[in-house]
Swiss-Prot record:
Lineage: Bacteria, Pseudomonadati, Aquificota, Aquificia, Aquificales
Keywords, in A-Z order: ATP-binding, Cytoplasm, Glycolysis, Kinase, Nucleotide-binding, Transferase
Protein name (Swiss-Prot/TrEMBL): Phosphoglycerate kinase
Main localisation: cytoplasm
Molecular function as annotated in GO: ADP binding; ATP binding; phosphoglycerate kinase activity
Organism the protein comes from: Aquifex aeolicus (strain VF5)
Name of the top EC class for this enzyme: transferase
CDD domains referenced in this protein's UniProt entry, alphabetically: Phosphoglycerate_kinase (cd00318)
EC nos: 2.7.2.3
Keyword Kinase carried by entry: yes
SUBUNIT field: Monomer.
Alphabetical list of SUPFAM superfamilies matching this protein: Phosphoglycerate kinase (SSF53748)
GO CC annotations on file: cytosol
Length: 397
């Protein structure tokens, strides 16, 4: 995958460099940035370009606006970024059009312009060729650095690098791909994957791919109940995808054939409904009564995870172990985060909920790498090619 060229492979001095960043940051009701991790993640690329005296043109989307909606403006992002790089970041009034061309053409070396929200134009998500050509005309070099949208076939991600050459990876994208390859392509073994989340359907391709690549796989979260029911156990009112029973049985068989150790939780914290006020108790996996549902993994399962990862050299984690937004049911997820943080293995985690849980556990810095992409991270784990890489320049053999 890293046969793609990176920023270090091209001359950017004095050039207009068009960078697709991911500034899709959460905002509160007043339009203030709640978490600027994604802005900070782009700094190595932006600062490298400034050091090289490039003219830096940044483009991103924010949210899912139906049309031009001021509440989705990138203005707060321009302000925050300028604080980090200690220079003015000019917010263009749009991302295409005559006024934008004029602003870009009058840039001096070391200037930074942030184009307004790409999704103010439906052509972005429609992957429209003319829109992509217009964006491409703004730059002399294209840099892909928006891992969070890498799995989307959108104009700025997929088509612009087709029309604007050279087209290379920025440092964030390079880092994401490098760590993924360390975990999945040429890993130190044993490799352990820990998967959580609610639905098998959303992780099906991931499970199918991982079963062929890892040595041990632990499936937690509500996904576990679909597997337990497929094995003939009662799971009370726990969330189950009945249409995936056969698929779950097949996956269990594949794991057996490949001699991959597939683990499920051995106890659960159960409640009568998904709420802070529900009564709770801890029961072994085969004793969930009718009218109750599993909402977190129990303490014995946490010990099981500890045992599973004890000899691991590489650990990949995606998805919470329970309904961790509710305090009563966050314990399993928080404890797993802490266990991985203490491990000497290479630890890589990804996915919005997972990222949130690691922050909640206060162990973010103890992980080797936490991916900035949710969907893109899952696509990689599922063994799929990312649209954002397709049209980038290949390194010479």
């Amino acid at each position: 995958m890293l046969r793609k060229k990176t920023l270090r492979d091209v001359d950017v001095k004095g050039k207009r460099v068009l960078v697709r960043v991911d500034y899709n940051v959460p905002l509160d009701e007043q339009g203030n940035i709640v978490d600027d991790t994604r802005i900070r993640a782009s700094l190595p690329t932006v600062e490298y370009l400034l050091d090289a005296n490039a003219k830096v043109i940044l483009m991103s989307h924010l949210g899912r606006p139906k049309n031009r909606d001021p509440k989705y403006s990138l203005a707060p992002v321009a302000k925050r970024l300028s604080r980090y790089i200690n220079k003015e970041v000019k917010l263009a009034p749009d991302c295409v059009g005559e006024e934008v061309k004029r602003i870009v053409n009058s840039m001096k070396e070391g200037d930074v312009v942030l184009l307004e929200n790409l999704r103010f134009h439906k052509e972005e998500t429609e992957c429209d060729e003319n829109f992509a050509r217009e964006l491409a005309s703004l730059g002399e070099v294209y840099v892909a650095d928006a891992f969070g949208t890498c799995h989307r076939k959108h104009a700025s991600v997929y088509l612009v690098p087709k029309f604007l050459k050279p087209a290379v990876m920025g440092f964030l994208l390079e880092k994401e791909i490098t760590y993924f390859e360390k975990a999945m392509v040429a890993p130190q073994r044993p490799v352990v994957a820990i998967l959580g989340g609610a639905k098998v359907s959303s992780k099906l391709e991931v499970i199918k791919n991982l079963i062929r690549r890892v040595d041990k796989l632990f499936i937690g979260g509500a996904m576990a109940f679909t597997f337990l029911k497929a094995m003939g156990y009662k799971v009370g009112n726990s969330l189950v995808e009945d249409d995936l029973q056969d698929v779950a049985r097949d996956l269990i068989d594949v794991a057996k054939k490949l001699e991959i150790k597939l683990y499920l939780p051995v106890d659960f914290v159960i409640g009568q409904e998904v709420s802070e006020n529900t009564p709770t108790k801890v029961v072994p996996w085969q004793e969930i009564p009718d009218g109750w549902m599993g909402l977190d993994i129990g303490p014995v399962s946490v010990e099981l995870v500890k045992e599973i990862i004890s000899d691991a050299q590489t650990i990949v984690w995606n998805g919470p172990m329970g309904v961790f937004e509710i305090d009563k049911f966050k314990h399993g997820t928080i404890e797993v985060a802490k266990l991985l943080a203490q491990s000497s293995a290479l630890t890589i985690a990804g996915g919005g909920d997972t990222d949130h849980a690691i922050h909640k556990a206060g162990v973010y810095h103890a992980f080797d790498f936490v991916s900035t992409g949710g969907g893109a991270f899952l696509e990689l784990l599922a063994g799929k090619e990312l649209p954002c890489l397709v049209n980038l320049d290949d390194k010479e053999a």
